[in-house]
Amino acid sequence: MNVLYDFRFNTVKSRTEYRAASSSGLYQPVTKFVLNSFRRRLDATAGIVTSAENIRTILESDFARKVHPIREYFNTLPLLNPAEHGHIGRLLNTVQVANPGKWEEYFTKWLIGVVANAMNDTGCQNHTCLVLTGDKQGQFKSWWLDNLCPTPLKNYLFTGKIDPQGKDILTLIAEYLFINIDDQLKELNKQNENALKNLITTPAVKYRRPYDVYIEEYPHLASFMASVNGNEFLTDPTGSRRFLPFEVLRIDKPTAAVSYTHLRA
């Protein structure tokens, strides 16, 4: 098997993944279909008769090296030359906001929190949700937020609506780098709003993964961001320091001048 494929155990998703040996392509999950294909290939080419369940048991052992793909990505980014600067500023210049005085300061703090959350298991390092608001639809708000996720990590980006009191959100917090809430914040009732505030800052989540026997605790990995059509979304008249709202006037699609690698490094 090692001659044909490279294997790793993804500690974020708690599953074994594979790719062709010596390939630089993305790893893919070992699904039931893949397991059956492995079994068929072993039987046909090597004369080894075994079960798909036996192969799965082997692959979910120290046969596959453990990897945290998100941390591996950040650890392989190049070290920046101190003389180089302004990568965040160039990205933020693609967005014209109504309150530009705080835009770079608070975005930078939030982005640092994203990386800190991903690199540390203890506690929640990012206590805020970046929110882009605006009266106009089709301003590319959600698109711009989605592009903050590196291409190699797109499997760790969730964009859509959430249930703050449901079980699925616990999986998203433990297994994703970004949760992009798409035009939902102004629809939340008071109960769901309070639940979301708690989720943003919770240090860990507890749930039982499919096919696991016990409920286990997992560190808070995800950082929250959101887009809203309109400028009013908080039902609490006193506001909330958990949300960092910026009213978008215009978004220009980033050009090649923006270095996303340097931005995240």
Predicted regions and their residues:
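A short beta-strand-to-loop transition that corresponds to the Sensor-1 phosphate-sensing loop
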Residues: 183, 221-231, 248-249
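Conserved catalytic/switch belt of AAA+ P-loop NTPases
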Residues: 194-213
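N-terminal nucleic-acid engagement/recognition segments and initiation subdomains in replication
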Residues: 1-86, 90, 101-105
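A short helix-turn-beta junction within AAA+ P-loop NTPase domains corresponding to the substrate/partner-engaging
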Residues: 235-252
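P-loop NTPase catalytic core of nucleic-acid-dependent motor ATPases
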Residues: 61-174, 178
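Conserved AAA+/SF3 P-loop NTPase catalytic/coupling segment centered on the Walker-B
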Residues: 178-200, 236-239
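Conserved small/polar residues in nucleotide/adenosyl-binding loops
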Residues: 261-265
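AAA+/SF3 P-loop NTPase mechanochemical coupling elements
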Residues: 169-174, 209-227
